[in-house]
């Protein structure tokens, strides 16, 4: 529990908006205030721990951070309000800070998990809101990221110009 408490308190002190830090040294220095995958993963972490410990006080402790983080993710990081947050995710590819499938998937799972937390804590309105968004996001992931031509999911949604820019940057870095 101490690692979760530390992660939560450092994130709050560093960001103050629900964003979860990405990289912290053993001396407490924050090297990366957070990409966009850590925040939804934190919500899912809290739900998974609760599934093991059944401690409602544990949920109550971190629920405000989860709500704040989901708000940050779905407002500040989703300017076009399509439920796909924009920014760097788990795939740390230089210049790839667009709508990415890993972040969309983590966000969908976090919405499901945060809805379950809200239900346990009897926050019905928030639970229903998160459930509705999770259902829409699941459908959008399966339609907008799916590439019929490649019979596979795309890594990110972007324009041809964005994709070419990534390739050009990769070639320059390889030199």
Give the positions of each predicted feature.
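Residues at the C-termini of beta-strands that transition into short coil/loop
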Residues: 24, 88-91
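Aromatic-rich carbohydrate-recognition surfaces in CAZymes
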Residues: 1-80, 84, 100-108, 114
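Asp-box/WD-like beta-propeller blade repeats and closely related beta-sheet repeat scaffolds
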Residues: 63, 91-94
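Catalytic cores of carbohydrate-active enzymes
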Residues: 20, 78-87, 95-102, 106-175
